[in-house]
């Protein structure tokens, strides 16, 4: 073995070996199962640090359960990522001078599949470097043939239960991507903008009402003013009419409980391009008219400003209204504005025909399950509350997207008739042009990836899956949808437990991103430090629901631990191996391994990986390296030490798979993944070894404190206890000491009194130091006495200063007397 840990030597082709030997091909289940369906990364790019963290957690848990004797399944997959992939492909085509509109739909889809294949090869290469134990015989793609059958079947089953409908409703519209998006794909951000205070004159009156709005560009779609029915200031105006400032038409004043009396003047203009406004219009049977088109420009409803960008038009409209006396004032405010998560464009609210999932019944089913004993267990628990609150206020889900790349909606139209089925009903029937939201397809992955609705073999063995590991940021996007989809189709929960981890941030707490330039490429880290180092740096800093502040120091710490394990293994491997029974030290070490294993088993159940990391670090650096290896240096035989090393490698394997696999193969000629988690004896007579260590520590501390050379034999004895000759021999060898009955210098430790014969060299040094101290004290006393006999000082100095000098003189004399007596 090399003198230093070489991760490239250790990790080269090791995952390839695991795959060839089929260590992680899920067997026909005969033992207790442990299964995880891995969150599918998008085929839009490379894996980032967050993907690596997630994959490492899953892989470590699967390896742990395999060593515990479980039948394991870690199923890999990738997501077609509808909008994101289509944008990437369009950008790629644009570089070649090709527009999407230049291609037929089928041609564009082929381009998307070609893109997917290239990206998937890159992702698989990255998985290989990470060392993830996927069962690639069962890998899935959210747009493969089986997935298309499953998604269509799911859609039809929802339709048959009247849980899917097509309706013209206010939806979130991405003007850049030209598609509808769901509510949770809208991110609210604080934006500085202008608040316009508009004058609405009462019919046939010089009196006016002031209405505050940040969206002056929607004024032409105003159909009413609304006040809260509890607002006594305006209640007498309900039913009256006001003059529209722009069109000069009359619009009515209504009362609605959704109006906030605290916002602006407490009067709200009811117009298109707001979901709340649309709801009020429907409730009061008011006609709605859009004034903004699909591209974010003003339409024919505003002839004077038609074609103007919605935001540019704000100033134009404000100037016109000010000129005509309908603008009271303008203020600058900061308010939340909805942005598309996909394009970062400000979302527009438009009324459009779309496909929706009715969420009331599905939400009630999920909340009911959360109230049952069979509910999914969330780690940390507070995310269950978050999920419950979200479902209590949920809206219907917009599932149609105006894209080409994705699952086609299984609906066929002919004239005014339509049919919901997978295959075409016949000639003249045209399939709906839209595709389904990506989360609609990934929302059934918990059971569809296992074969539903065509093959139930894996479902019988591994469903519900044991665990889902994912980031808390997609709790509502993905976890929630798998939950209600599984309850609807499978009549049971999709997984037993959900472990939600946080985000990876830089060392000052900022989210890692391209725009900030603080992102780290996991493949570059692996190239420099190795996969085990990255795994350890991420996993051993993980706690459920918590973010990680990542920095290079964490990698250095992890690499040092790997190097320490390497050095321990090399030392033990070089020892003689003739048979020998375990001695007291071996049994003590075995008990330390027992404690480590117990701590890992205890904390892995709670997913407290940071605690596991601390336990492993303390064990390797403390018990194994500083203690056990030091203790066995008193002998040349490593027979039992090798047995203990083998057990440690198996215990550490889930967290350091490459290194432990290499060492097991190199030293023991065994495959670590063919082993079982070792049974370890608990040794109860540990105190004898702890006593030896206590004596060694204190003798070493004494030697270090007084800088006594190792060439000088330290003579000592234990006053209040007896040690065997074998135990004394160990102490002597590890402290360069010798037992000698004496009572010259007694050191009291936690449990003992150690008498040390002070070496002559130290006595001479000590005497020299004391003589110097005496000379110093005498000179200080002389100085103090001169000051205190100085008349000028005594007459001019403050009383406090004189008293201070006298006190100082007394202490100096006491100290001098002590040294002279000594």
Swiss-Prot record:
Its EC number is 6.1.1.9. It catalyses: tRNA(Val) + L-valine + ATP = L-valyl-tRNA(Val) + AMP + diphosphate. CDD domains: Anticodon_Ia_Val (cd07962), ValRS_core (cd00817). Keywords: Aminoacyl-tRNA synthetase, ATP-binding, Coiled coil, Cytoplasm, Ligase, Nucleotide-binding, Protein biosynthesis. GO terms for biological process: valyl-tRNA aminoacylation. Residues 765-822 form a coiled coil. This is Valine--tRNA ligase. Monomer. Belongs to the class-I aminoacyl-tRNA synthetase family. ValS type 1 subfamily. ATP binds at residue 514. The keyword Nucleotide-binding applies. A motif ('HIGH' region) lies at residues 41-51. ValRS has two distinct active sites: one for aminoacylation and one for editing. The misactivated threonine is translocated from the active site to the editing site. The C-terminal coiled-coil domain is crucial for aminoacylation activity. InterPro entries: aa-tRNA-synth_I_CS, aa-tRNA-synth_Ia, Anticodon_Ia_Val, M/V/L/I-tRNA-synth_anticd-bd, Rossmann-like_a/b/a_fold, tRNA-bd_arm, tRNAsynth_Ia_anticodon-bd, Val-tRNA_synth_C_sf. One of its GO terms (cellular component) is cytosol. One of its GO terms (molecular function) is valine-tRNA ligase activity. NCBIfam families: PRK05729.1, valS. It is an enzyme of class 6 (ligase). A motif ('KMSKS' region) lies at residues 511-515. It is found in: Cytoplasm. Catalyzes the attachment of valine to tRNA(Val). As ValRS can inadvertently accommodate and process structurally similar amino acids such as threonine, to avoid such errors, it has a 'posttransfer' editing activity that hydrolyzes mischarged Thr-tRNA(Val) in a tRNA-dependent manner. It holds the Pfam family Anticodon_1. The keyword Membrane does not apply.
